[in-house]
């Protein structure tokens, strides 16, 4: 899990990022990102009830994505806010290396 410093603390930042951010979409996960003035990255992972009804399974997906983000965090651009929105329950069972590759590719596309 990422340190609390690198996570969103309130809904205001998430709403601002949704409203003013740019989106990169893949079939399983999309990334909404926006530049911030804090000097470090902030990250949130969103898994809706449409993806998985069970809260236990949604939290498992969220923990896996946070762990993949933590593994690839040094490749993330500085001074940006990131919201990962999960669209597929396949993320719960996909290979962790594949998930890390997906997160890394989203980070690299956000730099361009």
Model-derived features: positions:
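Positively charged, solvent-exposed patches that mediate nucleic-acid binding
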Residues: 1-112
């Amino acid at each position: 899990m990422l340190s609390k410093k690198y996570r969103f603390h309130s809904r205001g930042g998430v709403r601002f990022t949704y409203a003013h951010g740019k989106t990169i979409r893949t079939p399983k996960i999309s990334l909404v990102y926006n530049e911030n003035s804090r000097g470090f990255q902030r990250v949130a992972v969103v898994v809706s009830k449409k993806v998985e009804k069970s809260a236990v399974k949604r939290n498992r997906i969220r923990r896996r994505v946070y762990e993949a983000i933590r593994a690839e965090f040094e490749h993330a651009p500085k001074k940006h806010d990131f919201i990962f929105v999960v669209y597929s329950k396949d993320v719960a069972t996909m290979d962790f290396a594949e998930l890390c590759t997906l997160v890394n590719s989203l980070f690299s596309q956000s730099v361009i």
